[in-house]
Regions:
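Active-site metal-binding core of divalent-cation-utilizing nuclease and nuclease-like domains
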Residues: 4-105
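Hydrophobic, gly/ala-rich membrane-insertion helices/peptides used by toxins and envelope proteins
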Residues: 5, 10-13, 47, 59-60, ...
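Short His-Asn-centered micro-motif
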Residues: 94, 112-115
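Solvent-exposed, acidic/flexible segments
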Residues: 6, 10, 112-113, 120
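Extracellular, luminal, or virion-exposed ectodomains of exported proteins
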Residues: 1-7, 138-140
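Catalytic cores of nucleic-acid endonucleases
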Residues: 78-89, 99, 106-107, 114-166
Length: 181
């Protein structure tokens, strides 16, 4: 799959990975063990996933709408972007895909870094809080992801999306199991 291009023409590999895993989750009726870009309310203990009201295994599609509807009405303080009030790991792997990605159902929180993007200490600590421990937080780098490989550019869009979602899911499984699958 080819990565999306940003406004300045830069490859957006992260959105490529996320889109493929979202397609897989949608294809599986929001029952995939791989949940991309789930937002977490860091002011709850433990941090709470922000999920679709009608489908508890599906991440909420529009964070600004959720903030306006819930944060601003339920909390005594305003939401401040960039202050770590909400965190969005790249991928959350759940134990039971029929349940939401709450701390007790999290197998791993995965962060994928491309280029010069760094995994800062505050981010690592927040992800450990989401996951329920540092041992559940995993880091993947660009070498462990196939976004950007254009060998199958003649494949149909649906088969390509399914193939890339399966490839990314397989890579996650292989890396996290240390090759013991």
């Amino acid at each position: 799959a080819k990565p999306n291009k940003g406004k300045a023409g830069h490859n957006q590999y992260q959105s490529c990975v996320s889109e493929r895993l979202k397609e897989l989750d949608s294809f599986l009726g929001h029952r995939s063990p791989y949940k991309p870009e789930v937002n977490y309310d860091m002011h709850k203990a433990p941090p709470e996933p922000i999920m679709d009201k009608g489908i508890l295994t599906k991440a909420h599609d529009y964070l600004p709408g959720w903030i306006k509807k819930y944060w601003e009405k339920e909390k005594d303080y305003p939401y401040e972007a960039g202050e770590g009030m909400i965190r969005r790991p790249d991928v959350v792997i759940v134990k039971d895909p029929t349940k939401p990605p709450t701390q007790d159902n999290i197998k791993h929180v995965v962060e994928i870094k491309f280029g010069n993007d760094e995994f800062g200490e505050r981010q690592k600590n927040d992800y450990a809080e989401i996951a329920g421990g540092e041992h559940k937080v995993k880091l993947l780098d660009a070498d462990e992801c196939d976004c950007g490989n254009s060998k199958d550019s003649n494949a149909t869009e649906v088969s390509t999306a399914g193939a890339w979602a399966a490839a990314i899911a397989g890579t996650l499984l292989y890396v996290l199991s240390r090759g013991k699958t």
